[in-house]
Structures are given as structure tokens and as C-alpha cells.
């Protein structure tokens, strides 16, 4: 679900306190959104609808300070409010994580070229929007979406950079399939979908017990 900036900041702090690298999925390939998340302390960004090398380079420009990118210098939490900018700048040159989200057939077709960029650390598939870009939203058995996902699977097999997949409806068989396909970066479920499906499952179980 969508969250505001203060909620994002709180989540970054909680995740960091558990010695895990916080990644923020921004709502758009927008320099202000990316900069705010990074200045708040995100270790990396997941950027939606990266369909081309040009889209990827736009995000890279927003993530990195010159000379790699054109990110403006802000003295926020990540830079220890100015006291730690020099240390942060050294860290940022090598440690920022950039994960493009591939959720359009154009992104699938350009995936090899996108992954060839040094600053790209991997990718994650957004299956629903990908199926929508093929005019078959949610039709997982349709030949066009099957072919597109097979093409991505081949890219995963031929690249050292990790491939990811968003499994929207948590399902053990789907999870096992994607892991077998070589995906190593899994977004498993969606908060509201997970709650709704779990409640439905439990209610069905309760109904069966009552019938006995």
C-alpha cells in the first residue's frame, strides 16, 4: 500500500536497526522522490516502469552525485545532517543499490541492455503491469505473457546480476517455481492481499469445522 514520506522514514530506521539494507520502491522514476528516499537513509531504490536504457540512466542520474549522476547535495539523515557528508559520499560511490522494475514488454525486450549498465544491480519483474502491457492483464496462461516470462527467465540464466519477481498472491508452488527459474530476489505477497487471503482461508477452515 502507498505510504507517505514520514512513514517511509520510520520504516527505513526500523529496517536499519535490524542490520538490514533498506530498499525503497518509489512511486515513479522521479528525481525528487528518489533523492528524498536516499537522503532519508535508503541504501537503494527500486524504480518502477524502467523500459529502456534511457529510463535506467535517468534513475542513475537521480541516485548518484556528480560525476556519475546529477543528484543534488542534501544534508539530511543519510549524511548525518551535514556532519557525515564526506563519509556518505565515499559510501554512495560504490554501495548504492539500484533495482529497475521490469513491468512492460519494452522493458523485457531491453533487459539485456539495461543490465549491461554498471550501476544496475539486478531487476525485479512486476507481473501484473507486464501482462497489462500485452493487453492480457492477469491472464497468466496466455501465450504472450508465457513467452515474455520465458524470455526473462533466459536473461536470468545468462546473467550474474540477480533477477527478482513479485509474487503478488502468496503461493508455495509459485514460490518454488520462481526459485527454480533462478530468481533470487523475491517480493512475496502484498500486504492487503496477504491479509485478505489469509482471513478467507481461516474463515473457510472455521466453516468446515462448524459443519462437522
PLM regions and their residue ranges:
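Expand to "…catalyze enediolate/carbanion chemistry for C-C bond making/breaking, isomerization
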Residues: 1-212
Amino acid at each position: 500500500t502507498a505510504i507517505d514520506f514520514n512513514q517511509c522514514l520510520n520504516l527505513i530506521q526500523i529496517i536499519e536497526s535490524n542490520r538490514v539494507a533498506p530498499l525503497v520502491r518509489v512511486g515513479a522514476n522521479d528525481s525528487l522522490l528518489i533523492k528524498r528516499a536516499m537522503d532519508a537513509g535508503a541504501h537503494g531504490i527500486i524504480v518502477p516502469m524502467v523500459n529502456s536504457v534511457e529510463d535506467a540512466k535517468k534513475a542513475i542520474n537521480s541516485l548518484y552525485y556528480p560525476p556519475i549522476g546529477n543528484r543534488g547535495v542534501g544534508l539530511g539523515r543519510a549524511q548525518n545532517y551535514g556532519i557525515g557528508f564526506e563519509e556518505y559520499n565515499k559510501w554512495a560511490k560504490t554501495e548504492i543499490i539500484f533495482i529497475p522494475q521490469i513491468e512492460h514488454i519494452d522493458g523485457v525486450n531491453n533487459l539485456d541492455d539495461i543490465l549491461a549498465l554498471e550501476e544496475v544491480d539486478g531487476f525485479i519483474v512486476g507481473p501484473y503491469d507486464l501482462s497489462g502491457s500485452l493487453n492480457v492483464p492477469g491472464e497468466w496462461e496466455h501465450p504472450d505473457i508465457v513467452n515474455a516470462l520465458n524470455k526473462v527467465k533466459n536473461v536470468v540464466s545468462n546473467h550474474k546480476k540477480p533477477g527478482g519477481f513479485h509474487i503478488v498472491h502468496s503461493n508455495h508452488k509459485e514460490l518454488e517455481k520462481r526459485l527454480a527459474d533462478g530468481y533470487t530476489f523475491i517480493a512475496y505477497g502484498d500486504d492487503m492481499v496477504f491479509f485478505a487471503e489469509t482471513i478467507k482461508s481461516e474463515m473457510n477452515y472455521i466453516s468446515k469445522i462448524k459443519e462437522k
